Design a protein with these regions (language model features):
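Contiguous, glycine/small-aliphatic-enriched amphipathic segments in soluble metabolic enzymes
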Residues: 1-111
Length: 111
């Protein structure tokens, strides 16, 4: 099996979700099933809705969960928010730390 490609969703108040969506639409289907986004599922879903982007999402709890071949796979990291583009700095720092910590653990596992 080919190695997975892990991408951190990044700063919630930025344009990262838009970049992820545009890139997702341009890559081929063979590559899509290897990509996993580390971020908050509800946040990305809300941002896509506001930006009027229609990409199907698949929430996964663990890196070894079966990834969907045609949906954007999101490894869910907890984050509380009311407005998906106006999140408090304190919550952002904690969220980004958890995302990087998760990515670091995955890289140590060599998945």
């Amino acid at each position: 099996m080919k190695k997975k490609i892990i991408i951190i969703a990044g700063e919630p108040n930025s344009i990262n979700s838009e970049i992820i969506a545009k890139s997702w639409k341009k890559i081929n289907n063979n590559l899509k099933n290897r990509i996993i986004i580390i971020g908050n599922y509800e946040l990305i879903k809300s941002q896509f809705k506001i930006l009027q982007i229609s990409i199907q999402l698949h929430k996964i709890e663990k890196i070894n969960d079966l990834a969907s071949k045609k949906k954007l796979n999101i490894l869910d990291i907890p984050l509380r928010f009311k407005n998906p583009f106006k999140i408090i700095d304190k919550d952002i720092r904690k969220y980004l730390f958890l995302c990087f910590e998760c990515a670091h653990k995955i890289s140590k596992q060599k998945i």
